[in-house]
A protein has these predicted regions:
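N-terminal leader/targeting and assembly helices and adjacent pre-domain segments
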Residues: 1-175, 180, 298-299, 303-351
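A charged, amphipathic alpha-helical module
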Residues: 157-200, 215-219, 224
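Acidic, glycine-rich two-metal-ion catalytic cores of nucleic acid-processing enzymes
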Residues: 195-306
Length: 351
């Protein structure tokens, strides 16, 4: 297994496992080629042999990938802990730089923050446990789906052969076509959408690492008694549509920094909207690429978050372009599977 350094590597590792599961399945189909496609007796014998190979497939996969999944899950926990440490360190740098600009801040006494930090430690461990538990369920699901698809292909191949598929390769390709189009989409979301293990892992780990990073930042702000943050424009980047209403707004971080729930800044008495309310309205949804930074009243540059009509139109076009790109990438993966794992030469060429 390749070295894992970030969520991209984890997604790639899961995608490699998915492709290995499919490749192993197709190799078995190829090695048990049925020569007499119109002989029912021969097909019955073929099914018996293939069902035996399925049991071996299940056993081998559980043994091989069980160890790989365990290693990956340990890396996931490590990445989440590292994300919090990085957020904490970066925030220390931000605040120390602000102090150089005569920011009147003093660290809050240990006693005043000890319980807060204990709570955050528990939150971090709960986040890690929830993420790895969900990944274990998804990992179990991908192996189960591979087994189910294997069995379905065995039975469907004979059905297609009996309806005039022509050759063994064509019969198997007809039986695998829908499966190869979709991939091992073993995870079903609440809205009914199905996703592969690699796609789900990308979303889950990116979301967990982001929350851990924001928690690390928040803990450091709490140490210095700073609770105000701002959702900045993303340079040349494009904010998520759900996050646009919050860009450029100063807020009280009552989620990760433990800011006052009434939204009133202890430093100036100014009342700001709460991060928790923004999250409830869609900020920091899964796969969100936006983030907030510390806003130090009297030191940080006042917000410039209002978008012109032209900027909003550009944002809409960028989002549409990104969606088209993501669709094209999904189509590319689909046809790569069909081309790589089809047995019939004509189908390989077609896809």
């Amino acid at each position: 297994m390749a070295r894992i350094n970030d969520e991209y590597d984890i997604g790639a590792a899961f995608e490699a496992i998915e492709n290995e599961l499919i490749a192993s399945m197709i190799r078995n189909m190829e090695s048990h080629k049925q020569e007499e496609i119109d002989e029912d007796k021969q097909w019955s014998m073929w099914q018996t042999e293939m069902l035996k190979s399925l049991e071996e497939y299940k056993h081998n996969n559980q043994k091989k990938y069980g160890k790989q999944f365990k290693d990956i899950n340990e890396k996931i926990a490590e990445l989440i802990r590292t994300a919090r440490a990085e957020g904490n360190m970066q925030q220390e740098i931000t605040i120390l730089n602000a102090i150089k600009k005569v920011f009147p801040a003093n660290k809050i006494s240990k006693g005043g923050t000890a319980e807060f930090f204990k709570l955050n430690d528990r939150k971090l461990e709960a986040l890690i446990k929830a993420t790895t538990d969900d990944m274990k369920k998804a990992e179990t699901a991908v192996l189960r789906m591979a087994n189910d698809q294997y069995r379905r292909i065995i039975y469907n191949a004979q059905v297609y052969a009996n309806t005039g598929a022509g050759t063994y390769e064509k019969a198997v390709d007809m039986a695998t076509k829908d499966f190869l189009k979709a991939g091992l989409n073993c995870v079903e979301y609440a809205n009914g959408a199905r996703h592969t293990l690699a796609d789900y892992a990308d979303m889950a780990i990116r979301t967990a690492a982001k929350r851990a990073y924001l928690q690390g930042e928040g803990m450091k702000r709490r140490e210095w008694g700073v609770y105000t943050v701002i959702i900045n424009k993303r340079g040349s980047g494009c904010p998520c549509p759900l996050c646009v209403p919050f860009v450029g707004k100063v807020m009280i971080d009552d989620v990760w920094s433990g800011g006052p729930k009434d939204g009133v800044s202890p430093m100036t008495g100014i009342k700001y909207p709460l991060i928790s309310a923004a999250i409830a309205a869609g900020l920091y949804h899964p796969r969100c690429r936006d983030s907030h930074t510390t806003y130090i009243e009297g030191v940080s540059t006042p917000p410039d978050g209002k978008y012109t009509r032209e900027e909003l139109n550009n944002l809409a076009e960028k989002n549409a372009r990104r969606e088209r790109q993501q669709y094209a990438e999904r189509q590319e993966k689909k046809y790569n599977r069909l081309s790589q794992f089809s047995l019939d030469p004509e189908n390989q060429k077609k896809y």
